Amino acid sequence: AVRSICKRIPQSEWELVERFVREFRMKQEPNPPMEALLGELKEQGYHLFLMSNTSHRFRAFSKNIPSVGYMDGIWISCECGYLKPEREAYVDFFRKMKIEPQESYFVDDSPANIEAGIRLGMRGCVYHQDMPELRRNLREAGIDLKDA
């Protein structure tokens, strides 16, 4: 899987792909603070979408990830043939989810993915597994949140 992905992305992203594949299962654990944030955003009427570089297996095991239940739409790379941060991945995501980049706020753990989204008109921030920082970034972007 790693070789197949790395053939289609810049070499500067190879290490990130290798780390992602190694840690993928660990990152699928429930994340109560993230679930609380997603629930709060849904209560306020925000539409939430997942854009993920992942395999077909995601659909099967995503039922066990509570955060996925908050999503209005899910885009996974294996179903379209593009990977973040490829421009075509974002264009396909916008089209399939019927969203405008300028109306979106993108959160991702890869700076390259955020930069690609920004180039196409999105606003966003890199998520460093730091919930207070993420909440601060969302507030600074004009997204109202409760105090945590």
Identify the residue ranges that each predicted region occupies:
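Short, acidic loop-to-helix structural element flanking the phosphoryl-transfer center
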Residues: 8-49, 87
